[in-house]
């Protein structure tokens, strides 16, 4: 399953982020948030994206724990102590598949890119059958929700996937998470099928890149 806290990316009218290469191997997202200052929203100019390291695990696990508590309060029973657990996150880091968004030198969002997916993905009518990656465990810290970070994090995942040469991103989205569904649909992800996991029904979604 993918995301609970991608719901954080509810920033309509935002210009696409521009991504440039950082000399230390990070991606810099230069962000201009038009009109948000008048709404009391935080006005960020930069996020730093990088691969997660073993020493990040404690902060990453805390971020997911906070997100799970927030989703529970919002009536979104998508994640729990079973998934995503600390072992799963540790393996994501060890395999070099987890990426962090740092805001003010603290992890603010996380995503995972790999080629792992449930056999039920065969239910999807995929437009791109061969050249793709799968987006998992997209999570935005509750402390920065509703400030556009969900959208920016998805954009960073798309940019990374494109840089790796693939033509599409796939994901599964919990049907009881309206915030995530709205985010993905607005960003051009198409519903291509249905699956049922332990926590209930999910949509299979796909976006062709480039």
Predicted regions and their residues:
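Acetyl-CoA-dependent GNAT
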Residues: 54, 67-72, 78-143, 154-155, ...
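Alpha-helix boundary/capping motif
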Residues: 4, 12-15
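Conserved GNAT acetyl-CoA-binding A-motif
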Residues: 154, 161-172
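Conserved N-terminal entry element of GNAT/NAT acetyltransferase domains
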Residues: 31-55, 210
């Amino acid at each position: 399953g993918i995301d609970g806290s991608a719901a954080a990316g509810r920033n309509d009218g935002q210009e696409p982020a521009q991504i440039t290469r950082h000399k230390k191997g990070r991606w810099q997202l230069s962000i201009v948030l038009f009109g948000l200052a008048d709404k009391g929203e935080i006005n960020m100019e930069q996020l730093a994206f990088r691969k997660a390291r073993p020493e990040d695990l404690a902060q990453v696990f805390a971020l997911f724990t906070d997100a799970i508590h927030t989703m529970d309060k919002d009536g979104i029973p998508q994640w729990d102590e079973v998934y995503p657990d600390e072992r799963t996150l540790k393996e994501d880091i060890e395999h070099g598949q987890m990426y962090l968004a740092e805001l003010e030198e603290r992890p603010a969002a996380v995503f995972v890119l790999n080629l792992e997916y449930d056999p039920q993905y065969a239910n999807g009518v995929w437009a791109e059958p061969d050249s793709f990656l799968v987006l998992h465990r997209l999570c935005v810290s509750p402390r920065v929700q509703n400030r556009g970070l969900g959208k920016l994090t998805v954009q960073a995942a798309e940019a990374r996937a494109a840089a790796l040469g693939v033509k599409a991103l796939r994901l599964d989205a919990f049907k009881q998470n309206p915030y995530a569904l709205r985010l993905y649909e607005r960003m051009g992800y198409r519903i291509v099928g249905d699956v049922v996991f332990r926590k209930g029904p999910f949509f299979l979604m796909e976006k062709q890149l480039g």
